UniProtKB/Swiss-Prot annotation:
Keyword Ribosomal protein set for record: yes
Gene name of the record: rpmB
UniProt key word Ribonucleoprotein: yes
Name of protein: Large ribosomal subunit protein bL28
MF terms in GO: structural constituent of ribosome
Family from the record: Belongs to the bacterial ribosomal protein bL28 family.
Source organism of the structure: Ureaplasma parvum serovar 3 (strain ATCC 700970)
Amino acid sequence: MAKRDQLTGKGPLSGNTRSHAMNHSKRRWNVNLQKATIKTENGSQRVLVSAKTLKTLKKHNLLA
């Protein structure tokens, strides 16, 4: 399963981790994915969304 928000498409970012000696190694910053049940025309559907999207859904009262 892809580490991607199913509603907004937000995915992981990549970059380098740096030590004090300025050594670097590649790493990924993954999205904080949460399971949520949202309201749809046909009832409700379970989706994987980021924590920020979940806050927005709660703000607009779109959770089932």
